[in-house]
Amino acid sequence: MLNSLDLAGRPQDTRVVVAMSGGVDSSATAALLKSQGYDVVGITLQLYDHGAATHRKGACCAGQDIHDARDVAERIGIPHYVLDYESRFRESVIDSFADSYALGETPVPCIECNRSVKFRDLLATARELGASALATGHYVSSRRLADGSRALICAADRDRDQSYFLFATTREQLDFLRFPLGDMTKPQTRDLARQFGLSVADKHDSQDICFVPTGRYTDVVERLKPNAMEPGEIVDLNGRVLGSHPGIVHFTVGQRRGLGIASRAPLYVLRLDAARRRVVVGPREALRMERIVLRDVNWIGDGALDRAVGDGLELFVRVRSTRAPQPAWLRAVKGGYEVELVAGEEGVSPGQACVFYDAAEGQARVLGGGFIKSAAPRSIAEPAHDDAASPALAAMRG
């Protein structure tokens, strides 16, 4: 007989480690599992703070969060541990964040944190503690497949769905992970936290990158990669110099404001040439890309990736966390994989993720994804499939 976490055994005989960030989501997760009788252990990762800040309420974002996690653990009566992962986090997340910006990319540090820290090191720690699962407060779901493995599923609350940030999760990790909030809405989570009397029930959600609480990510990049702050030229598609800039780190693909150049028509950042320290700008129509070259592809769909792709796999992709999935074709090419966007997409930025889904809406299954290495318009891409032959495009158009 399986318990509510789809694990064999009674809840009281099942140890579950909960990754507690100090926010309402992970706190409600811990309280819910405790109320269901599980042997819950809370762990908070100290990622970017030092010394007394971990013990002093309100010292900084990380210090406050650790204080809140401890408070919740005490309230619900579970053991709680704080693990110092600062060095690991700096090497795996912060340094790669700065490297990515220096290369002219727009990184997503939350993906790297989940991939390199939470779902690898923390998961290993949970196993060492004798846990049967690691639970988090992410808004995603998972379900058991016929072969016993687990699939990653979008959250019921579409506005809160975090599947984009978890595409790099491996099959082995999915087998051990649980997401109790996947079928809940944010208001329901807050109501649950109030029912348990948690002090964080009305705590504001974090809006910034956790290690950049001021929102000035350029400060981090300047400290670690000062060459990314070197000035350069702003040029048009023909290479004509239109102006100058204080460093490519200040720009991202699709940006319109803050260019500091006069033009009769609106200009947008089309790409960043880190080698020549150039910001290439042009009209909005030049932003539309149809072909995406991927790197570090992770596949969690059925079977082996190459067999699933074959001569081309029709699916849906999301190229930014805030955008809806759209029809696409995934193809194997020499040295990697490419995605052809059926209808094109504006502002496709290297460094962002391209996440695969089996449907455009609802609780779709996440099939994997990869990081965007480069993008190109249709004029230099492979010929697209005829729209009439694409059921995915028909589904998008309704």
UniProtKB/Swiss-Prot annotation:
One of its GO terms (cellular component) is cytoplasm. Its EC number is 2.8.1.13. It is an enzyme of class 2 (transferase). It is found in: Cytoplasm. PANTHER family: MITOCHONDRIAL TRNA-SPECIFIC 2-THIOURIDYLASE 1, TRNA 5-METHYLAMINOMETHYL-2-THIOURIDYLATE -METHYLTRANSFERASE. Belongs to the MnmA/TRMU family. This is tRNA-specific 2-thiouridylase MnmA. It comes from Rhodopseudomonas palustris (strain HaA2). The lineage of its organism: Bacteria, Pseudomonadati, Pseudomonadota, Alphaproteobacteria, Hyphomicrobiales.
